């Protein structure tokens, strides 16, 4: 199958959208911490109810054996991380997990497959899975890697609501993290997703030895997507033994909160998801993230192959903070 590059105005100014230069975003990062959180909270309240939170559950439907060399990922076939490879799960098993997620309050069911990208033969089964989960009354999101021509349209027709395709890190830092694809590969698939009419879930990871300027570059790249992503997951690196980033320098908690706040200010109408890494965050840190504009979490004890807070703990935290699930 021939893959045609789609030209998309991803990182160019738009007359109806504020253009965020890296310098401008970096200046936001330099704002005194409490003032930055306050500004982000004000922006958040203009566009969202600050006392509701969107709950998503993420399930790995095909695990391990990925040919990519992403330095953060325990599912890469290039690293010895103890992850057990698992082929694409059957529809029935996925539907059972989706039913449990719905019964526990999740409104969106996200499915991830460890591929560079799906092959044409995989799409038939994926569309069957999407239809079955949609029949439960859940929103659906898929993260299956780089898409070939026509695949996004097939996923849309099956009922997929969101496609997750993170840009990972700033363009300037990309080759330090991934060598088997480049930044433009991600933009190409994002263009196909938009063209098919799917909603975009697109974010990145912080704590991968990047500089603050490179964190600003990540946020600027996301904020200048046209249109901006409906959902922006901000992940804190989960360091896994066996991956090249297992010994990455620890990111100070205030810097992570700053990243959430800057994402909220630059993407005021997007859901900002407090994503991977929550297991290592205190309740106080998570509360600061919600104050700074995060209004979505992954809900469930596992994120693909890494640990996530258990539902009971999240319910308790939400009760303490008077947060209610979005309906």
Swiss-Prot record:
Keywords: 2Fe-2S, 4Fe-4S, Biotin biosynthesis, Iron, Iron-sulfur, Metal-binding, S-adenosyl-L-methionine, Transferase. [2Fe-2S] cluster binds at residues 110, 141, 201, 273. This is Biotin synthase. Residues 51-278 form the Radical SAM core domain. GO terms for molecular function: 2 iron, 2 sulfur cluster binding; 4 iron, 4 sulfur cluster binding; biotin synthase activity; iron ion binding. It comes from the Bacteria. Binds 1 [4Fe-4S] cluster. The cluster is coordinated with 3 cysteines and an exchangeable S-adenosyl-L-methionine. Binds 1 [2Fe-2S] cluster. The cluster is coordinated with 3 cysteines and 1 arginine. The keyword Kinase does not apply. Its EC number is 2.8.1.6. Pfam families: BATS, Radical_SAM. SUPFAM superfamilies: Radical SAM enzymes (SSF102114). Belongs to the radical SAM superfamily. Biotin synthase family. It comes from Histophilus somni (strain 2336). It catalyses: (4R,5S)-dethiobiotin + (sulfur carrier)-SH + 2 reduced [2Fe-2S]-[ferredoxin] + 2 S-adenosyl-L-methionine = (sulfur carrier)-H + biotin + 2 5'-deoxyadenosine + 2 L-methionine + 2 oxidized [2Fe-2S]-[ferredoxin]. It is an enzyme of class 2 (transferase). HAMAP family: BioB. [4Fe-4S] cluster binds at residues 66, 70, 73. Homodimer. One of its GO terms (biological process) is biotin biosynthetic process. Disulfide bonds: none annotated. Pathway: Cofactor biosynthesis; biotin biosynthesis; biotin from 7,8-diaminononanoate: step 2/2.
């Amino acid at each position: 199958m021939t893959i045609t590059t789609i030209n998309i105005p991803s990182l160019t100014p738009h007359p109806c959208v504020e253009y965020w230069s890296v310098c401008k975003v970096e200046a936001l990062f330099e704002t005194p911490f409490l003032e930055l959180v306050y500004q982000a909270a004000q922006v958040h309240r203009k566009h969202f109810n600050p006392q509701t939170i969107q709950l998503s559950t993420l399930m790995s439907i095909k695990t391990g054996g990925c040919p990519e060399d992403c330095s953060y990922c325990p599912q890469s076939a290039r690293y010895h991380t103890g992850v057990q490879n698992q082929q694409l799960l059957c529809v029935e098993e996925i539907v059972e997990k989706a039913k449990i997620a719905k019964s526990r309050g999740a409104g969106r069911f996200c499915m991830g497959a460890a591929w560079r990208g799906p092959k044409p033969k995989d799409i038939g089964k994926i569309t069957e899975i999407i239809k079955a989960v949609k029949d439960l009354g859940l929103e659906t999101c898929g993260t299956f890697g780089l898409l070939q021509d026509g695949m996004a349209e097939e996923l849309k027709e099956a009922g997929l609501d969101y496609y997750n395709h993170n840009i990972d890190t700033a363009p300037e830092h990309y080759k330090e993290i991934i060598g088997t694809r480049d930044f433009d590969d991600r933009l190409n698939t994002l263009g196909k997703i938009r063209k098919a009419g799917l909603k975009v879930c697109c974010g990145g990871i912080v704590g991968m030895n990047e500089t603050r300027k490179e964190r600003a570059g990540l946020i600027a790249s996301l904020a200048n997507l046209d249109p901006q992503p409906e959902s922006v997951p901000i992940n804190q690196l989960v360091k896994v033994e066996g991956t090249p980033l297992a010994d990455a320098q620890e990111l100070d908690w205030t810097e992570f909160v700053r990243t959430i706040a800057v994402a909220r200010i630059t993407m005021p109408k997007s859901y900002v998801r407090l994503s991977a890494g929550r297991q290592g965050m205190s309740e106080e840190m998570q509360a600061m993230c919600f104050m700074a504009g995060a209004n979505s979490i992954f809900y469930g004890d596992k994120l693909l192959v890494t640990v996530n807070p258990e539902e009971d703990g999240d319910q308790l935290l939400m009760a303490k903070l008077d947060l209610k699930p979005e309906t």
